[in-house]
Each structure stands twice: as structure tokens, then as C-alpha cells.
Amino acid sequence: MKLINCLSGGKTSSYIAANYKADYNVFSLVRTNDKKCLFPDAKIRQIVSDKLGIEFIGTLEDDMIIYTMLDLEQYVGNKIDWVTGKTFENVLNSAGTLPDPLRRFCTTQMKLVPMFKWWQRNINKPAKFNLGFRANEKRRAKRTLEKTNKNGLLEMKAIVGKRKTQNKWGIIEWQKPVFPLIKDNIFKDTIVEFWKNKPVRFAWMNNCVGCFHKHPLLIKKMHNKFPNKIEWFASKEKIKHEKDVWYKSKNLSFNDIIKWDNQTELFDDDFNECDSGYCGL
């Protein structure tokens, strides 16, 4: 089986790219069409557009993730394949509602589907995928393995042909999840120490800045850091009805959060990757 390193832009998956040789390194980028979220460096925008094969306007993650992946490619000395799917706007338009913890179609459409389509083009037979779960994340690994079929492979529903004028859908087995950091007992402290004084820049926190898995207080802090991006998330609420907000269980809108007063200064260290949403593969 071919071996693929799945990269999210964080220190953990980047550690895998730097320390575990694979046939491919693949990174899936979340994009937006919104010019208010324009990536500021025109030259880098063009580089990213060339890598993706489609115009790159901006991302709804921290812009630093772009520099992370460019730095990482130089540091490891191996090509990183960049992939992308629909823009977040198009994903929401197709769904007609917002995602939530039980229907994380944002992750499926913007992370998994682009990687699956890349796999179809380049490999198209079951392959091993190194996933960035650390030694203390065995429960996450267990949940992933519980989704595999009898052959130990994850499946994807995809178009496999045509039936008259209609698409013919089928189930394709494609990914054998592998957890090298769990196998080698690698914890966060080892990874943090490894990246000290290395020429790779990292974002403070990965995944979309307005991910609904983040604590509302963290969303307020993210608004202070990335006002245009959080306002993008706020603008997408109430697609379906008045209670169609990112925090459905709380009936709490991003506009409510944005209006909160800053009673105390929230420091970066008040939050960790448990607050990030874990959308990275």
C-alpha cells in the first residue's frame, strides 16, 4: 500500500511530515470567496493559486497556515500536494443550513472530499494514511477505527458512473488509518520541543477561526484577532430559520458574541487545541 501523510498545518501533523517518510504529503485548504478575507500578500496568493490549480482569494483559517505549509515544504525537502474543495460559501449554499456537531459536513466537504478526489486521481486503490493523533489521543483513534469496514478501511460515498442521465453512486473503500505517534508513544511535549528554533512558522490555533466547536469566549477572542473572518461566520447565520445559528444548542448567535464587552483580557494560553475543533486530519 502507498503511504500518505495527512497534513493539517499544525505542529503535530507537521512533525509526522518531518519524521515519517511517506510516498505523499497532502494538505487540504479551506477557501472563501469573500474579498474581505483576502489573503494580504498578492505574490503568495498567486503561489497558492498555482499549487491548487484554482484561484485562491483567502482562507477562513488563520492566514499563518499558508506560511506554515510553504515553510514546511522547504524544511522537509519533499513536495506537499495542496488540495481544496468547494469554497465554504458554496458548501453552505448546497446544504441550505449550517453544520453542527452531529452533521460536520464542513469537514467532509472541505477536508475529506478533496483528499479523496486527490487519492482517486493519483492512487485509486486502498492506501495507508498517517493521521496526527498523539499518544494521549487513543480514544480519537478508537473512534476513527470504529468507522472502518471489515477490511479495516474507511469508505467514501462517491459517483462511480452514470445510469442513463443520473449519476450512479457507490461506496468506495480507500483509507487505512495509521497512527504513528500513538505507536511510538509521542506526546505533545516532544512535538513542541522538536519545533523550537526550527524555520517553520505556526498559527496560534488551527482550524477555521469560527469553528462551532470553539468556546464562545474563544470566538470573542478570535473576533479581536480576525474581525473580518468572524464577521463572515456571523453573516452566514439564520440561513434556514431564525434559530439556524452556529451554536444551535445554546441558541447563541455570533452577532451576540461579537457584542459582548471584554470584561477581562483573554490570553492565548487560556485556550489550547482542545478548543480548536479538531477538523485537521
Please report, for each region that a protein language model flagged, where it lies by residue:
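Nucleotide-activated chemistry modules centered on ATP-dependent adenylation/adenylyltransferase
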Residues: 1-281
